Amino acid sequence: RGTLVCAVGSTEAQTLTNLEFFKFMRDRFGMQLDIYAWDAGNLDGSGGLYAAQRMDALTKQYPNGYRPIADAAAEIGCRLGVWGGPDGYGDDPKTEAERQELLVSLCRDYHFALFKLDGVCGGLREEKQAKFVETMQKCRKYSPDLIVLNHRLPLGIGEPYATTFLWNGTETYVDVHICNPKTAMHHREFTFTRGNVPGLERLAEDHGVCISSCPEYFEDDLLYQAFGRELILAPEIYGNPWFLRDDELPILASIYSLHRKYRAILVHGMLLPDSYGPNAVSRGDGTRQFLCTGNDSWNMRLVKVKLDAEIGLEKPESGKVSVILHHPYTEFLGTFAYGETVEIQVYPFRAALVECCHAEIAEDMPKDCAYRVIHRQTNGCVDEIE
């Protein structure tokens, strides 16, 4: 899933403008967003203030309801999600039924893809756990693939109906909820030493790579999230991508598009030896492996990549392996014999993404030059570079 979490207490006009931005990103750079998720204040508010208690505000924010938003999202192949609380069922049967109908209607009428249950919007009373379970069951009749994020909440018997947990209870909100443990060139050094979810579990969430608080080197953080941890919502960003410079927009799009092209095989991951770099991971299907690694030091680092089972690569019939660098720029590094060792240079405090694949299935690409991808077609093929 390519996901964005955005917009605290937004409005219809603001949301339509934001979706227009992602239409531009799709048309200009080939980036496809799967889920656009509203933050708190677009259904439930903070401090246990549920939608039924703030209908006047919601009517002002969305005078036409969610229909124009859902339609605009659908036009660009996207679905909606929203933050909220797990309760809101009140103390009487009428309020309980209205709350359930509200949540079910989001899936039935607007095809919502995501509910984020956050403690900021309130907790779940024990006596309402059964009603929560019933509501989630009814919602999934209309959105069978509904993702329910659990942010720091005890849900009791409702726990199995949540899709994810918040990894380490920490949001990837730079300099707000997470920061560097040591001096570095930029504010995202923590990316390299943060670790991986135990067992490379994918049904977890890290709140998305926050752009609002720190745009610099978002791409390295996003690579570790999307190709390293590869959580269910990856690649996931949080905040305001329009804060990025114009020259950074194709970088964002390229990460989303490359991940989308190979997402079916990226679900298979393995941890690499420490010699490959901090928390390095290899993902793929044996014929094509993507290695995500980084450098958390002030010096250049040479990573020796063994082109064999050490990185999960099966032996090709041809005996040849193609090696492509995808980040921090794109470059065809050559074709080598299976079992050879290739040295990859990783810059200080930067991430690197390397593809190692059977030579016979390597994608056509320019040789003898380094470049940046500007646009990918819907099938993932690159048709514009610089």
How should each PLM-predicted stretch be described?
Residues 1-87, 97, 239-273, 283, ...:
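Conserved structural scaffold segments of CAZyme catalytic domains across common CAZy folds
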Residues 26, 105, 279-281:
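Short, flexible, glycine/charge-rich loop motifs used to bind or transfer phosphoryl groups or to couple energy/partner
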Residues 35-219:
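Aromatic- and carboxylate-enriched substrate-binding clefts and catalytic-loop regions
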Residues 128-129, 303-308, 368-369:
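Composition- and surface-driven signal marking solvent-exposed, interaction-prone regions
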Residues 134-331, 341-356:
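Active-site-proximal substrate-binding groove within the catalytic cores of carbohydrate-active enzymes
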Residues 333-385:
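C-terminal beta-strand-rich structural cap/linker in extracellular carbohydrate-active enzymes
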